[in-house]
């Protein structure tokens, strides 16, 4: 397994970091990323492939972030930046997939404009193919795989610097989860839902809390089902608002990218539709 490739052999005592429940959870997560990366290479056309890989990386980053204060910052930062860069490689591909899914759902409203073989969908599929080809070059050259191995090595180094045994980790985890919950609830009260940055940031925090509550359950001895359920609800509600905003701006960028006046018109019309739907959701929220 590539996960073990960069494992250090240096003698390290007391080595609390590597033999803990937390370390085994992180190593499982690393194995999950390897599986998702292999699955993407098997079927890059399937929208779920890139999405699953990004989610696996996001989960790992949330779990590393959870112990940020308890290990060496240098390795934490290195691992975090590496993993973020890898996830970002698949970011535009994911945005295109979300947008195409939305277009297919809107086909009832605009049957001609959004026909599968029509101008809009053809343009989007060609754009996606181009992006997929760019990613394929990174894979074929070995650059992306090397980046993943570097990220794994930094993650392993970070684990070695965490000097908490399981009992200490349990205590720290309970404390941190409480703190995260309080902070999130405070932010929820203060958030301006019409502000994309604030909404997006709150959604990320809800995901972090959900992932931590889910995957750190072995440390706590049980799953905090209420928190997980609550955060899933927050995430879903904010997700639609965020997607509509991203889609709207993406469509405007596409209108600027093409010289075809018909396509420009279609993209702008669809963009307007996304922003109007977002507005309607915000008005519902206000009522």
Q: Where are each of the predicted segments found?
A:
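Function-determining surface determinants
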Residues: 1-287
């Amino acid at each position: 397994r590539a996960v073990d490739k960069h494992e250090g052999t240096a003698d390290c005592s007391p080595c609390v970091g590597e033999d803990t429940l937390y370390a085994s959870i992180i190593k499982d997560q690393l194995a999950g990323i390897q599986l998702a990366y292999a699955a993407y290479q098997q079927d890059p056309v399937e929208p779920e492939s890139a999405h699953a890989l990004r989610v696996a990386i996001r989960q790992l980053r949330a779990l590393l972030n959870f112990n940020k204060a308890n290990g060496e910052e240098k390795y934490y930062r290195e691992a975090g930046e590496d993993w973020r860069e890898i996830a970002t490689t698949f970011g535009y591909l994911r945005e295109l997939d979300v947008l195409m899914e939305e277009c297919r759902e809107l086909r009832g409203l605009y049957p001609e404009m959004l026909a599968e073989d029509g101008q809009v969908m053809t343009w989007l599929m060609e754009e996606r193919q181009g992006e997929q080809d760019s990613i394929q070059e990174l894979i074929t050259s070995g650059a992306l795989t090397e980046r993943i191995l570097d990220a794994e090595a930094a993650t392993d180094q970070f684990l070695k610097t965490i000097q908490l045994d399981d009992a200490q980790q349990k205590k720290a985890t309970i404390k941190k989860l409480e703190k995260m919950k309080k902070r999130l609830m405070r932010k929820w009260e203060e958030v301006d839902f019409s502000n994309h940055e604030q909404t997006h940031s709150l959604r990320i925090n809800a995901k972090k809390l959900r992932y931590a509550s889910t995957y750190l359950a072995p440390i706590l001895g049980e799953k905090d089902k209420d928190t997980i359920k609550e955060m899933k609800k927050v995430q879903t509600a904010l997700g639609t608002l965020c997607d509509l905003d991203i889609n709207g701006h993406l469509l405007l960028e596409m209108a600027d990218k093409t010289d075809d006046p018909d396509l420009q018109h279609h993209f702008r019309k669809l963009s307007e539709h996304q922003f109007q739907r977002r507005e309607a959701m915000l008005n519902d929220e206000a009522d």
